Amino acid sequence: MAVAERLVVERASKTFSGGELTVFADLDLAVRDQESVCVLGPSGCGKTTLLRAMHGLVGLDEGRIVVDGSVVLRPRSNVAMVFQHFGLMPWKSVTANVAYGLELAGVARQEIAERVTRYVELVGLKGFERSYPHTLSGGMQQRVGLARALAMEPDILLMDEPFGSLDAQTREILQDELLSILQTTGVRGGRAPATMVFITHSIEEAIALGDRIVVLSARPARIRETISVDIPRPRTVASVVAHPRFVELRDRCWRLLRERTA
């Protein structure tokens, strides 16, 4: 039985500056239900713009993006995004930040309280519910952003380099925690892992988190190659790095990123 496609990008193109700057062109990508796809590419090639288009935050000049059979025109309640720079509201506590999206979605007050408690604890922030962002480390702030997204119990999780600004130790801890959540707990009320699209500059991170890696060219971005990560799950970052396939996959990604394209 074929696995359903949850998110489909069809001949997507995006320009800025009145059409003078083409960010990406003719992109086609299909992401299956419960699949984790990591996107690698040079700086400025449009990775973040593509992710924002998947969420309905920016429009396309050509092509379309389809989620569950419907064209994406605006943000959807079953899609959640985690931003690179946390995106927290500094005047709100941890609890209030995590609850914010649920309140906008009109979730019942009791359900909001239950979900906030569940996901704050899941990301390791129990005891910090009343804390404000300025009192938290970068890693803890990103945990808040992750809890806020997970609390929506989304079908699709969009991650825009969420660990890129963190130190190496904190980054690996959060990578392992994300793997654990997706592989064992799930984000839809514990029923199943969400579909995930994860933007990163780190080859190691892409291999650790992804079922497939999409390598983009320099701007205007096109898909150079899609690589299957044939390392079994469940995984940890350490187990991936120690796997015999890791070096080959890393070198293959490096070669693609280093090659100059027309």
Regions picked out by a protein language model, each given a short descriptive name:
Residues 40-42:
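The feature captures the beta-strand-to-loop junction immediately N-terminal to the Walker
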Residues 55:
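Helix-to-loop junction immediately C-terminal to a conserved catalytic motif
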Residues 103, 110-128, 179-180:
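Conserved ABC ATPase "signature" region
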Residues 132-136, 140:
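Conserved ABC ATPase signature
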Residues 151-155:
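A short, proline-enriched helix->beta-strand linker immediately N-terminal to the Walker B motif
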